[in-house]
Structures are given as structure tokens and as C-alpha cells.
């Protein structure tokens, strides 16, 4: 077997090995076509089966009601930042954005370029370096708000909404870094979007889930065609040539997720990984210092912490790499260490890291 490292990169991130092995087996002859899936027409029945299976598996794993559409788009969260206000904030509609980190701030900035003062900041923890999430009492949400936008997991800062913001308004949510980490009730969500490259598949696919009443808000015939959610829904995400190989890998990952017990089993693994990693940080509190100030806000997808000095941070990363673990260097604006423990990272992988951390603290503390 080819040598594999333990991948803690924040994105693009590791993928389940069985999903990759399936792609390896089918790479040169997909579905008996004598071609790779990368070479097959997106209008062929062989590709169409993959496309539909990815949509069906998304619906099944997330328990989506019939009044939600699943779209397989491109452009990542960056394009979605603009598409959302272009489609949903027409005719003077207003929205409130909760700013909890680097990506939430970018989403707000892009929305303001489109809708100006109709995009309002409901709360921000920027003054505290986004080291915690806003409390319910800090949220200022207008009665005239069409939706409340938030980022469910803040990849850079390592905070996560395990309980969604308290409001009676519909949610629009960037779930790029924690989609499908657990089951949840989607009924309050008008739109969910997620770049695939952290928890679902390779870069190049943006999974978008939109409720039908929100789709009806998207009367946007004056927009360039690709920017219209309604058109993509009508064409079943085949208006243009889709990222076929990315969707194929997405299908493989979703099929694997189903085979291991779905989102309930995935949640159990994610919670166990969090217990192990945060347990180690708290056990060595004089050596490892977490970035997040409120324990309830700690992310189970991205864990940020610091060692006593930057030199030790660098040594930690280098020695971990020698031990077969990569992707641990912290985000450039924060520094320290960042461990990304997305769905594809196993409990055993985290146990290996925690063993390394215990020994590193013993030797250097």
C-alpha cells in the first residue's frame, strides 16, 4: 500500500481512504465505458447516475424535506458570498449578518458591495479577535430581516455554533467547514452553502441547499445566467458543464458516509476526537494554550492552540511532520498550531496526535 500521512490540513483536506480507493479502481474504466469519469460527457447516462446519486445521498444523509433543492455549483463560498445578496436582497430586502471570524467578515463585505446598508451587522466579536461567539443577548436582529446569515464553523479561529443563533428569522449559513458533521434540523434554514474541500470532497464543488420559498425570492432575470439560483434549480445543476470529477468524488464520500452509519456515527466520532484533543490541551494547560476563550464555543473541526513561544510552535510542526502528521501550522494571522479534524480524520489519527502532544509537553515543558 502507498504510504499515507495523517492529514490535518484545513482545506483542501483529507478524504476517506475508501472513497479514494474506489476512484483509483475506476480511474481508467468508469462504469464499463472504457474511459475515466473525467472523460465522460456530462450528458451521458453513466455520469447522470453519479450526479443523481450525489443529490439523493445528500438528501438522505441530511434528512432534507421535499421542499428543499440540492444544487451542485462552482465558485466556492466566495462566489456564494455575492450570489446570495444578488438573488435574495432584491427590492429593498434587508438581512442581518453575524460576524464571527475571517470568513464571516468576507461574506458581510461582499454582501454590502451588493446591497449596501440593507446588509446589517447583527453582532461581531472582532474586538476580541473572534476568540468567542456572540451571546444571544448581543444579537441585534431587525423585525424586517429577510434572513440571518452566519458561519457555522469558523475555520481560522476555531469556534463553532453547536447551538444555532436564537432567532425566529430564517437562516442563511456558510457550512463550508462543518457540513454533515452531525444530524440537525434544517427546517429553519432558507439556504445552506458549503465548499466541498473541507468535509465533503475535493475543491471545485459548492454544495448548495435552498428552500423553495427562498428560491421563489430569486426573481433575478437581469443577472448573468450563472448567478441565478433559480436557473440552476430548473436545470438540475446542469446549466453548464459541472465539475464532474469533483461531483464523482463527492458521491464516493457520501456513499462511504452512509456505509459507516450516516451522520449519527460521524457525530460520535467527531465528539470523541474533540474530547481527546481538548482533553490533552486542558491536561497540559501550562504548556498548551487554546485560542478560544469560551469552552462552549470550541470547534470540533478546527482546534487552535499555542505553545509557550513561536520557536516551540515551529519545532512542534517539524517534529510532527517527521512522525507522519502534516498540516499543523496555524493560520498566518493567528499563528500557533491549528489541528483540523474533519470527518475523514479518524479517532485513531487524533489518538496518535495526542500521544505526540503528551510526549512533546513532557520533553519541552
Label every PLM stretch briefly.
Residues 1-41:
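N-terminal "arm"/small-domain region of PLP-dependent enzymes with the aminotransferase-like
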Residues 5, 322, 331, 335-365:
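PLP-dependent enzyme catalytic core of the Aspartate aminotransferase-like
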Residues 16, 196-278, 294, 365:
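Active-site C-terminal subdomain of aminotransferase-like
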Residues 32-80, 87, 102, 110:
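Conserved N-terminal alpha-helix of the aminotransferase class I/II PLP-enzyme fold
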Residues 78-146:
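PLP-dependent aminotransferase-like
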Residues 111, 124-179:
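Active-site phosphate-binding strand-loop segment of PLP-dependent enzymes
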Residues 172, 186-197, 206:
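Conserved active-site segment immediately N-terminal to the catalytic lysine
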Residues 288-319:
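Conserved PLP-binding catalytic core of the aspartate aminotransferase-like
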Amino acid at each position: 500500500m502507498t504510504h499515507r500521512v495523517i492529514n490535518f490540513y484545513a482545506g483542501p483536506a483529507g478524504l476517506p481512504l475508501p472513497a479514494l480507493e474506489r476512484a483509483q479502481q475506476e480511474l481508467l474504466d468508469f462504469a464499463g465505458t472504457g474511459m475515466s469519469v473525467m472523460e465522460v460527457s456530462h450528458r451521458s447516462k453513466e455520469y447522470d447516475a453519479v450526479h443523481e446519486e450525489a443529490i439523493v445521498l445528500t438528501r438522505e444523509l441530511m434528512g432534507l424535506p421535499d421542499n428543499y433543492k440540492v444544487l451542485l455549483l462552482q465558485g466556492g463560498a466566495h462566489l456564494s458570498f455575492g450570489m446570495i445578496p444578488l438573488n435574495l436582497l432584491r427590492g429593498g430586502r434587508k438581512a442581518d449578518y453575524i460576524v464571527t471570524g475571517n470568513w464571516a467578515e468576507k461574506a458581510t463585505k461582499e454582501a454590502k458591495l451588493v446591497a449596501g446598508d440593507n446588509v446589517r451587522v447583527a453582532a461581531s466579536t472582532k474586538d476580541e479577535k473572534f476568540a468567542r461567539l456572540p451571546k444571544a443577548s448581543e444579537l441585534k436582529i431587525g423585525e424586517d430581516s429577510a434572513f440571518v446569515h452566519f458561519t457555522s464553523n469558523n475555520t481560522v479561529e476555531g469556534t463553532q455554533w453547536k447551538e444555532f443563533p436564537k432567532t425566529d428569522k430564517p437562516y442563511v449559513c456558510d457550512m463550508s467547514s462543518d457540513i454533515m458533521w452531525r444530524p440537525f434540523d434544517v427546517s429553519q434554514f432558507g439556504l445552506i452553502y458549503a465548499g466541498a474541500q473541507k468535509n465533503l470532497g475535493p475543491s471545485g464543488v459548492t454544495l448548495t441547499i435552498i428552500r423553495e420559498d427562498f428560491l421563489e425570492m430569486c426573481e433575478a432575470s437581469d443577472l448573468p445566467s450563472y448567478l441565478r439560483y433559480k436557473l440552476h434549480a430548473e436545470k438540475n445543476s446542469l446549466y453548464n458543464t459541472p465539475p464532474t470529477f469533483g461531483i464523482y468524488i463527492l458521491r464516493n464520500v457520501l456513499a462511504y458516509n452512509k456505509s459507516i452509519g450516516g451522520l449519527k456515527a460521524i457525530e460520535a466520532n467527531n465528539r470523541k476526537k474533540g474530547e481527546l484533543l481538548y482533553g490533552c490541551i486542558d491536561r497540559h494547560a501550562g504548556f498548551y494554550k487554546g485560542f478560544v476563550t469560551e469552552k462552549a464555543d470550541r470547534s470540533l473541526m478546527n482546534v487552535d492552540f499555542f505553545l509557550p513561544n513561536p520557536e516551540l510552535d515551529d519545532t512542534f510542526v517539524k517534529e510532527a511532520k517527521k512522525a507522519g502528521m502534516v498540516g499543523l501550522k496555524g493560520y498566518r494571522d493567528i499563528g500557533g498550531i491549528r489541528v483540523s479534524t474533519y470527518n475523514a480524520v479518524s479517532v485513531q489519527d487524533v489518538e496518535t496526535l495526542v500521544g505526540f502532544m503528551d510526549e512533546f509537553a513532557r520533553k519541552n515543558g
